[in-house]
Structures are given as C-alpha cells and as structure tokens.
A protein has these predicted regions:
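Active-site pocket-lining/capping segments in soluble small-molecule metabolic enzymes
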Residues: 1-87, 101, 106-289
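As written
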Residues: 96-97
Length: 289
C-alpha cells in the first residue's frame, strides 16, 4: 500500500489496533543520500509514536545510521538488499535485524545454508551479536529474479518485460551435456515459445474473470521444502495487483497451508493442493526447481 500522508498513516494505525494485524512500513530504496538520513529517522520516530515499530529496509547504510542514532525499531532486511548469504549475516549481526527476507534468486539450498549458519552462530553464544530469528521467502507473484537491486530491464507499456521472456538458469559449474539432462523440458524457466503455446491450447487454467493463482510467479509446490529449510514467513507480492485478486491470493495461500498441515508427505500435499487450486493446470511460472 502506498501511503500519501501522515493522516493516512494515522487511519492505518487505527485499523491495526482494531483488527490486530501486523503492518510493516517499508523504506525500500536501494540507497538514500546521506543528507536524507536525518529526515528519514525523524519520519520513523513519528511513525513509532503512533504504533508502527517494524520497518523493512533495503539500504544497509540507513540501518547503520538508525542504530547509531539509538533508534531501536524492529528491522527486516529487504529482499532488495543486494546479496543474502552467510557472510552478509555476519556484517549485519551487530545491527540486530529481526528478519531476513530472502531474494527470489536464492535457491532453497542457499536459504537452508544461511539459516543453518545463523543457528550455529547463535549456539556459539556471541552475546554482542544478535542474529535474525525470522526468515521470509517469496511464495506468490512476480517471479522475476532481477526485481529491485538487480533489475536492468526497460519496463514500459510498449515492450514486454525481459523477465517474462522464456529463459533458463544454469549453474556455472555444470557442463552443457549435464545441463541438458538436468534441465530438459522444465516449464517456466527454459520452456520454448512453441511448447508454451502447445500447452496453452490443451487447457486454459485462467478463470473467466482473468484470475489465476500465481500467474506471475508461484512457489506453492515448495512450501514443504521451505518449511524444512527453516523459513518462518512467506511473502505474497501484492504491488500492482487488483484488490480482489489479492484477496483471492491470500485465501488460496492460507488454504494451501492448511493442506500442507493435513498432508503426511510432500507428494500428498502437492497432489491435493494442485487438485484443489489448479484443477485446469497452473501457470508453470515456478520460483524454484
């Protein structure tokens, strides 16, 4: 939600009190000018005065500035921060962030490695450092791994988004022959345009009003793996989406979590989830493989 004035924030604060739902304010620019930090700190203090204590930040220097000014608000490290790895957690540990939001480009194994590293460091009882206790991963919408810090594509009405062009990702250590065996016919990443058209002709998964859960990116099949890796929170992207589509996304994600809780195996979960949410097929815009 874009907030245009402080009076709108006050209205939102009253809604938070009424419905008892957490709201995090976002300062998601990749960097701010040093002369802006004082003003941002003042704005954050104003927001804290009406009950907003949690902030998502993408500018590392802003976090350092806030801690230097003794502003002890709750901080979530944004998925647009640039790089998320074990070494990065060491850099930020002294600034005591509460949550790390993993980027779209992070694989599940990379998330697991970072969380395991943090767990090991906590057990080492380095009292002067405070590591994150919450870990968030993308679950629905906006597949593009280059969003935010890594986006170099031209976005305009006249041209399609570069991230919507069929593509595939390749680990640099793999040879071409091994890659072909590992990546062959994996839809969403390396599917050809002709294959995509052929698949679309068989069934149309989009509803009559244009809605399809996870149409621009979906990680629902991986929720069991994310949970096992240590992910505690899921991110559902709503920016630019229709309000009613966003509401349906939320309901579908909640239902998916219920199905996951009732399933004894990952295979059973995926089968039941797809049967209920995607009876005519899904978007094939998968976050992870």
């Amino acid at each position: 939600v874009q907030i245009g004035s402080f009076s709108e924030l006050e209205i939102l604060a009253n809604m938070v009190q009424k419905y008892q739902k957490p709201v995090h304010l976002t300062f998601n620019s990749l960097y701010y000018r040093p002369e802006q930090y004082e003003e941002i700190a003042r704005i954050i203090q104003q927001c804290r005065s009406i009950g907003f204590e949690s902030y998502i930040l993408a500018d590392p220097a802003l976090l350092v500035y806030l801690r230097k000014e003794k502003i002890d608000c709750e901080v979530h490290l944004s998925g647009d921060l640039g790089t998320v790895n074990s070494a990065m957690t060491e850099v930020f540990a002294k600034e005591y962030p509460k949550r790390i939001i993993f980027q779209r480009k992070n694989t599940i194994s990379e998330m697991r490695a970072v969380i395991q590293h943090i767990t090991a460091q906590k057990e080492a009882t380095r009292k002067e450092w405070t590591y994150p206790t919450e870990f968030e991963a993308f679950a629905l919408n906006e597949l593009c791994q280059f969003s935010g810090a890594f986006c170099n594509s031209l976005h305009c009405d006249e041209m399609g988004y570069l991230c919507r062009v069929p593509y595939w990702k390749k680990p640099v250590s793999l040879s071409e022959s091994k890659l072909e065996k590992q990546e062959k016919n994996r839809p969403g990443e390396n599917i050809s345009i002709s294959e995509w058209d052929s698949a679309s002709e068989l069934t149309n998964p989009v509803s009559e009003d244009g809605y399809l859960c996870g149409a621009t990116g979906c990680g629902l099949c991986t929720l069991k793996q994310l949970s096992d890796a240590g992910i505690t929170h899921l991110k559902l992207v709503g920016r630019g989406n229709y309000t009613d589509f966003m509401e349906r996304d939320i309901r579908n994600l909640r239902r998916t979590l219920e199905i996951l809780e009732d399933s004894s195996t990952e295979e059973e979960y995926i089968r039941a989830m797809k049967a209920e949410l995607f009876p005519n097929g899904c978007s094939h815009m998968c976050y992870a493989r």
